[in-house]
């Protein structure tokens, strides 16, 4: 599968945000999700957000470089959606949206668009 690969660093607070977003996305799908799959789902949610400006503003506060390194893998088939999310975010900033900021926006969107209460996980009835 052809993909675009981005590698960047961020602060430990964003690492915690990513860990929780992955957990929430995994609970929602009932599968172990990767950081890339979680970010892509967040970008999808962001594109449909009622208030994308609020997500961008919140993400800008969290967009801090640091020592934690991540590799984000975007399949070429999803690159247009990824770019569309960055373009939407750019409407609310005075500069191009760097990949790290797009990543933080996506993680926040997972929280705002998936579960409000992530403690509930549907459990199938025993056979």
Task: Give residue spans per PLM region.
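Surface-exposed, Lys/Arg-rich phosphate-binding patches that contact polyanionic backbones
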Residues: 12-37, 60-62, 76-101, 124-125
